[in-house]
């Protein structure tokens, strides 16, 4: 090692000085002091001493690479969640609204968007109509990057870009199951189809899904969890 070689050189020089019989005690002591100062400087800054011996330029130690501020990789999958608004529409009017504001999970890759929609329940405001639709509205500001827990403009832009890469109103297949509660009994209700349509109006994302295909007044409606992929 360079440090060991340097120390060996200093000690050899010290011993040589001690062996010179013509030197006085004071001369040897002064040389020892010089060696001690050199060793102290070497401990404080080894590079400076070695460079002075070898006449080599002082090495440049690169600064540590800072951690990236944006941890999203262009090729990776971004997971987002959003608080959404769920409504059942039919006949040009709103028929029911979700009891709560459920959260949708969105996994966005460079080529696909996979949605995970939780179970939702509805208290009908009006009588159900055949051909109804379930509408889900997501405002831009309610979306969060699952990694940071905060709104992420990069993630939102990728979501919109991937969804609309082929058409402004992409569609995909989805299977949803509805149940209704009527006079204390729960029974299945036929769905109005199997197609989901997405749109991205200004600063929002809207989804239109099949609704309950029934013409009756219910106490409560439930839509089972769903998963679908836009590609």
UniProtKB/Swiss-Prot annotation:
Top-rank lineage group of the source organism: Viruses
Family from the record: Belongs to the aquareoviridae NS3 protein family.
Stated name of the protein: Non-structural 3
Source species taxonomy: Viruses, Riboviria, Orthornavirae, Duplornaviricota, Resentoviricetes
Gene: S11
């Amino acid at each position: 090692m360079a440090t060991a070689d340097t120390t060996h050189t200093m000690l050899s020089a010290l011993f040589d000085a001690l062996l010179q019989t013509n030197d006085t005690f004071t001369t040897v002591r002064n040389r020892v002091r010089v060696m001690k100062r050199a060793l102290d400087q070497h401990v404080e800054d080894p590079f400076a001493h070695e460079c002075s011996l070898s006449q080599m330029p002082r090495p440049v130690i690169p600064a540590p690479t800072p951690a990236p501020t944006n941890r999203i990789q262009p090729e990776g999958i971004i997971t987002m969640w959003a608080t959404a608004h769920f409504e059942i529409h039919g006949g040009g009017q709103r028929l029911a609204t979700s009891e709560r504001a459920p959260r949708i999970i969105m996994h966005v890759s460079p080529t696909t968007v996979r949605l995970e929609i939780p179970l939702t329940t509805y208290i009908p405001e009006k009588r159900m109509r055949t051909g109804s639709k379930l509408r889900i509205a997501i405002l831009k500001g309610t979306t969060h990057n699952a990694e940071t827990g905060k709104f992420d403009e990069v993630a939102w832009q990728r979501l919109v870009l991937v969804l609309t890469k082929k058409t402004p109103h992409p569609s995909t297949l989805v299977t949803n199951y509805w149940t209704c509660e009527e006079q204390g009994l729960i029974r299945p209700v036929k769905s109005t189809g199997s197609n989901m349509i997405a749109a991205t109006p200004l600063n929002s994302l809207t989804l239109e899904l099949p609704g309950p295909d029934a013409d009756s007044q219910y106490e409560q409606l439930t839509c089972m969890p769903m998963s679908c992929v836009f590609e």
